């Protein structure tokens, strides 16, 4: 199972740049989507971290607060090889407060502490803001045009390479290699590795369907029976008739075309869209059978990713680019449409 063959929206970029040469080349800030109210039994911490993975920092916060690890939550994991500003939640009923400036974890600083009346849960993020410095960029005639095109028309909403892992740092293989063992009948007993392998397998199949849709020339062209995702939530509906209203809603980004996240049961699509999706997944019967047997439900994911508030500027021969993305999407999927990314060997991200 390979991950380097998926189609570009246009052609492969000519420009090349070095990605994440140092942590502050990749700055991520969470966008929570709501404001903590200032009271309640949960303490929300706004933390800047560098060179730390999210789970490790959660452990250190729990130790400092003398609380069980289950009392500390976060909305999403952030790359170890970055400068990240993210929220942590600490369940601490009562009036007692902490001097968070005394949290002595090299690479971490608590910027703000405020109470809220609800637990910070995984998946509540509205999105993330990325500020990325690509170093030693080789210029090309179409670089500015590519950036403008991505800003206007979006990028394929591929799962990024982080989802599939890297076998260089695990002698037993990457997430995708573990997934291959799983579909061939091997039992993965480590719960965390099993979960990552399942996620990688499902993501890989989604990327396959998306890539084939681009290859067929139907990335932006709705098919009869397409499943449309509503912007900003997980709701969707089947469009059996591609009329002017549907086309207008697609143009205004009120809805987007989706592709399947495989699970048990029947595909939600109908007609031409159903025929297309079946034509792709039928080539991977072991994968579909494995995912269905795990009890996962059929779900959908938009095929297009729209970066918002995109800005860029040259800094000598480096390119600084900033944009915001919805939660659950990958900055690398935007970057790959603009230039060839050469990642520095920094080790595993989590």
Curated annotation (Swiss-Prot):
Pfam families: TruD. The keyword Methyltransferase does not apply. CDD domains: PseudoU_synth_EcTruD (cd02575). GO terms for biological process: tRNA pseudouridine synthesis. Residues 154-306 form the TRUD domain. GO terms for cellular component: cytosol. Keywords: Isomerase, tRNA processing. The active site is at 79 (nucleophile). It catalyses: uridine(13) in tRNA = pseudouridine(13) in tRNA. Transmembrane segments: none annotated. InterPro entries: PsdUridine_synth_cat_dom_sf, PsdUridine_synth_TruD, PsdUridine_synth_TruD_insert, TruD_catalytic, TruD_insert_sf, TruD_pseudoU_synthase. Its EC number is 5.4.99.27. One of its GO terms (molecular function) is RNA binding. It is an enzyme of class 5 (isomerase). Signal peptide: none annotated. Belongs to the pseudouridine synthase TruD family. PANTHER family: TRNA PSEUDOURIDINE SYNTHASE D (PTHR47811:SF1). Responsible for synthesis of pseudouridine from uracil-13 in transfer RNAs. This is tRNA pseudouridine synthase D. It comes from Pseudoalteromonas atlantica (strain T6c / ATCC BAA-1087). The gene is truD.
């Amino acid at each position: 199972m390979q991950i380097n063959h998926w189609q570009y929206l246009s052609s492969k970029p000519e420009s090349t740049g070095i990605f994440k040469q140092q942590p502050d080349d990749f700055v991520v800030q969470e966008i929570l989507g709501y404001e903590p109210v200032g009271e309640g039994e949960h303490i929300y911490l706004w933390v800047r971290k560098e060179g730390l993975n999210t789970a490790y920092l959660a452990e250190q916060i729990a130790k400092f607060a003398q609380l069980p690890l289950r009392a500390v939550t976060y909305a999403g994991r952030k790359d170890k090889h970055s400068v990240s500003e993210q929220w942590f939640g600490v369940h601490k009923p009562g009036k007692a407060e902490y001097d968070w400036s005394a949290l002595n974890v090299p690479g971490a600083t608590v910027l703000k502490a405020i109470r809220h009346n609800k637990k910070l849960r995984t998946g509540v993020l509205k999105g993330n803001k990325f500020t990325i410095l690509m170093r030693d960029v080789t210029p090309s005639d179409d670089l500015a045009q590519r950036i403008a095109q991505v800003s206007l028309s979006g990028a394929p909403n591929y799962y990024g390479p982080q989802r599939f892992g890297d076998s260089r740092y695990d002698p037993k293989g990457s997430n995708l290699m573990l997934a291959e063992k799983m579909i061939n009948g091997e039992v993965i007993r480590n719960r965390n590795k099993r979960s990552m392998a399942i996620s990688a397998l499902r993501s890989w199949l989604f990327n396959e369907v998306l890539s084939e849709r681009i290859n067929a020339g139907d990335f932006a062209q709705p098919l009869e029976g397409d499943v449309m995702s509503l912007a900003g939530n997980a709701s969707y509906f089947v469009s059996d008739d591609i009329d002017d209203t549907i086309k207008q809603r697609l143009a205004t980004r009120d809805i987007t075309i989706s592709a399947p996240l495989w699970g048990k049961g029947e595909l939600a699509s109908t007609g031409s869209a159903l025929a297309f999706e079946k034509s792709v997944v039928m080539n991977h019967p072991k994968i579909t059978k494995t995912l269905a047997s795990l009890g996962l439900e059929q779900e959908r994911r938009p095929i297009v990713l729209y970066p918002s508030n995109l800005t860029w500027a040259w800094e000598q021969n480096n390119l600084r680019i900033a944009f915001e993305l919805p939660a659950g999407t990958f900055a690398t999927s935007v970057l790959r449409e603009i230039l060839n990314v050469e990642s520095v060997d920094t080790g595993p991200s989590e």
